[in-house]
């Protein structure tokens, strides 16, 4: 019965099975059988004639007729062939029936079927033919080896003189004078007996019986399971004892000498062991060919999305402080970072950490700083191209280039603010003051640029070799390394990714802003001289509006409590250099959910201005501009007054900007607010006190502030 698994399995095709069987194996076995016939049953080959001693008693043993032997030759051949062959067939049948369901589970399983010549040969048929065929060939080979040795040696059997009946008178001399006779002086009439008496070494019974016993015993040892503790030993001992009996009968019946039997045992056992190990592979099935399964591909999307926001803060120190790539990989022409377009469904919330580092310099707790934002993250494969994984952005520390970028940024914001509110919803008395303010801002910017150019010519050019190196890390965000610089000129890094107009202001919020302005105008009785809000980037104009309204109304004072966050205890960050001059200011245009962060001096931590305490006297803002002049001080502009780094050239770290809403001191110009407050400060909030605001009072206060600022610039 063939198992279902065997039936369902597709058989293999073999082109060499039948040709080898028909043209190689069968001819060899047939030739051995034919040779054995001529050697055993015919007198075509005569044994060698060997001399003997006169009246040798060892050769004068009684002769037992062939039909009187305990195990005649034909019986020996049949037993040596039939018993092992029957045992092999029965064993293969049992193995096929019991182990057919274990196909492919190990090297000892049943072999699969093979198609050859249009016929399907299952494992039982092929294994049986193979093992029995090798056994038959071994028997023939053993008999041939024995006959060849016997014919070559011609040793006499113990009954040689009995069947030869030598005639000593034919010698012409007496046995005493010549005891060793080499002539043929046999006078017996049984020529067949005389011929067989000349072939005794080795014993044919011993060789054939030993071969059969050893061959079938090795088969039992290989096929029968160890679960049967006694079956295997019983079968092995049975065949071994039978072989021993066959050999010993030759000694007891004086058919062979003891040495002939022992030699026959050795020859037969050696042939059997060789064929069992090398011809049939110790009766084991060949190992099944296992198709190598390809390694499962890494699911980059699954790995990337499983990295949550909390896991980024639990990484060890080695992960967050990986060294940058080799200089050869980072150097070269700046190239844009490739971005993959994926569906919104693959976006996951992850943490983007930015580390500000100063390489090869001592670490300080006060100088260590880091901040993180939670941004949507596009899932990308974990194994990126090295060219995409590392990038180098060279930003020259040229003041003119920085001013050019800032002016372009301001120009874009001014153009966007011109399209902020629809004409039908904006009254004329609100648009006219806005145009005046814009013109004043442009004039001030031109004057400031001229002054900065003159100062730059006096100071001299900045070395062009000071470039910050930014390495983009897919998992932990960009890492900025600041090379040391000799001069005090700061580097202003402005993100190139600008939020497009119309990306952050909803129709509801714009409508609410218009309604508040209309109500404020009705209460104040006159137009308000402020710039209209920028489309989508609404916080800078809204901040000016709130400050102006609060000053006019004389609302309650509020003072923010600054909370310093020094991340020196975190194992994920590295502190910058102790040198105050080598610093970098990064404006994050992607973080709409965090307040503005300013970089303090090397001995002071970062300060966040978020919490508002009611009942105090002013608004204390974070250091929005991050750079201040330290030479001269005007009355009304203290160390904490906000001066944007857009309008200043010399840095002064560690200051806090304070705006007194009651007196109007510290009010930043619109250009400074636009330069300092970009997309990164949209979410910073202030309590607004809406009150009546007079047009003349606002204009007078703004005019006085501008005059103080101009006087300070001229003094610097």
Curated annotation (Swiss-Prot):
The keyword Transmembrane is annotated on this UniProt entry:
yes
How does this protein sit in the membrane? Multi-pass membrane protein
Q: Which Pfam families match?
A: PAP2
Q: Name one GO biological process term.
A: phospholipid dephosphorylation
Give the GO cellular component terms, alphabetically: plasma membrane
User: Membrane-crossing residues?
Assistant: 18-38, 70-90, 131-151, 205-225, 231-251, 261-281
CDD domains attached to this UniProt entry: PAP2_wunen
Q: Where is the composition biased (Acidic residues)?
A: 437-460
List modified residues, type Phosphothreonine: 374
Q: Which residues are glycosylated?
A: 167, 316
Q: Where in the cell is it found?
A: Membrane
Q: Superkingdom, according to UniProt?
A: Eukaryota
Residues carrying Phosphoserine: 320, 351, 426, 506, 641
UniProt biased composition (Low complexity): 562-575
Q: Which UniProt keywords apply?
A: Glycoprotein, Membrane, Phosphoprotein, Transmembrane, Transmembrane helix
Cross-referenced SMART domains = acidPPc
SUPFAM superfamilies for the chain? Acid phosphatase/Vanadium-dependent haloperoxidase
Disordered: annotated span:
311-334, 416-488, 548-589, 664-694
Supply the InterPro entries for this chain.
P_Acid_Pase_2/haloperoxi_sf, P_Acid_Pase_2/haloperoxidase, PA_PP_rel
| Entry's Gene Ontology molecular function annotations | phosphatidate phosphatase activity
Q: Where is the composition biased (Polar residues)?
A: 312-321
According to its UniProt record, which protein family does this protein belong to? Belongs to the PA-phosphatase related phosphoesterase family.
The protein here is known as: Phospholipid phosphatase-related protein type 3
The coding gene here is: Plppr3
């Amino acid at each position: 019965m063939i198992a279902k698994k065997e039936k369902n399995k597709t058989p293999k095709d073999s082109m060499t099975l039948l040709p080898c069987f028909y043209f190689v194996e069968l001819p060899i076995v047939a030739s051995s059988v034919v040779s054995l016939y001529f050697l055993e049953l015919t007198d075509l080959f005569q044994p060698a004639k060997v001399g003997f001693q006169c009246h040798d008693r060892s050769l004068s043993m009684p002769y037992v007729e062939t039909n009187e032997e305990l195990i005649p030759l034909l019986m020996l051949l049949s037993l040596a062939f039939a018993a092992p062959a029957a045992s092999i067939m029965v064993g293969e049948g049992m193995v096929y029936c019991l182990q057919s369901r274990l196909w492919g589970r190990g090297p000892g399983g049943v072999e699969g079927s093979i198609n050859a010549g249009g016929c399907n040969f299952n494992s039982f048929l092929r294994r049986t033919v193979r093992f029995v065929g090798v056994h038959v060939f071994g028997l023939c080979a053993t008999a041939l080896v024995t006959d060849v040795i016997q014919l070559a040696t011609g040793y006499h059997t113990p009954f040689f003189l009995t069947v030869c009946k030598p005639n000593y008178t034919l010698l012409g001399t007496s046995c005493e004078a010549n005891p060793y006779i080499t002539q043929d002086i046999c006078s017996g009439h049984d020529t067949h007996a005389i011929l067989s008496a000349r072939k005794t070494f080795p014993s044919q019974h011993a060789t054939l019986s030993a071969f059969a016993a050893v061959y079938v015993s090795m088969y039992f040892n290989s096929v029968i399971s160890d679960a049967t503790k006694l079956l295997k030993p019983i079968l092995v001992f049975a065949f071994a004892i039978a072989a021993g009996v066959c050999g010993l009968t030759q000694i007891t019946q004086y058919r062979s000498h003891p040495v002939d039997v022992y030699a026959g045992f050795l020859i037969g056992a050696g042939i059997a062991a060789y064929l069992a190990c090398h011809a049939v592979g110790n009766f084991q099935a060949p190992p099944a060919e296992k198709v190598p399964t390809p390694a499962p591909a890494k699911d980059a999307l699954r790995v990337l999305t499983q990295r949550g926001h909390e896991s980024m803060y639990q990484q060890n120190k080695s992960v967050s402080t990986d060294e940058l790539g080799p200089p050869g990989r980072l150097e070269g022409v700046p190239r844009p970072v490739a971005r993959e377009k994926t569906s919104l469904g693959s976006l996951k919330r992850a943490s983007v950490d930015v580390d500000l580092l100063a390489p090869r310099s001592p670490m300080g707790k006060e100088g260590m700083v880091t901040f993180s934002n939670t941004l949507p993250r596009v899932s990308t494969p974990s194994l990126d191209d090295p060219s995409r994984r590392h990038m180098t952005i060279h930003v020259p520390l040229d003041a003119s280039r920085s001013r050019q970028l800032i002016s372009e940024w301001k120009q874009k914001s001014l153009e966007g603010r011109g399209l902020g509110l629809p004409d039908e919803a904006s009254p004329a008395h609100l648009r006219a003051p806005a145009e005046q303010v814009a013109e004043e801002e442009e004039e001030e910017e031109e004057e400031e640029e001229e002054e900065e150019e003159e100062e730059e010519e006096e100071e001299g050019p900045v070395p062009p070799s000071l470039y910050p190196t930014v390495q983009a890390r897919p998992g932990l965000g960009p890492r900025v390394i600041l090379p040391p610089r000799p001069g005090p000129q700061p580097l202003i890094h402005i993100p190139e990714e600008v939020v497009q107009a119309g990306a952050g202001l909803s129709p509801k919020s714009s409508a609410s802003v218009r309604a508040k302005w209309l109500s404020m105008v009705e209460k104040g009785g006159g137009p308000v001289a402020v710039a209209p809000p920028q489309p989508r980037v609404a916080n800078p104009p809204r901040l000016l509006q709130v400050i102006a309204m609060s000053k006019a109304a004389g609302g309650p004072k509020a003072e923010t409590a600054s909370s310093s966050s020094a991340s020196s205890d975190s194992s994920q960050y590295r502190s910058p250099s102790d040198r105050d001059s080598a610093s970098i200011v990064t404006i994050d245009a992607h973080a709409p959910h965090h307040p503005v962060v300013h970089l303090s001096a090397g001995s002071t931590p970062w300060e966040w201005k978020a919490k508002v305490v009611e009942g105090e006297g002013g608004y204390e803002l974070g250091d929005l501009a991050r750079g201040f002049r330290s030479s001269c001080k005007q009355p009304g502009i203290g160390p904490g007054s906000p001066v944007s780094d857009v309008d200043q050239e010399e840095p002064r770290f560690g200051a806090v900007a304070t705006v007194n809403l009651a007196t109007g001191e510290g009010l930043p110009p619109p250009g400074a607010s636009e330069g300092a407050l970009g997309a990164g400060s949209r979410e910073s909030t202030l309590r607004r006190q809406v009150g009546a605001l007079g047009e003349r009072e606002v204009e007078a206060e703004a005019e006085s502030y501008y005059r103080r600022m101009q006087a300070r610039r001229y003094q610097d």
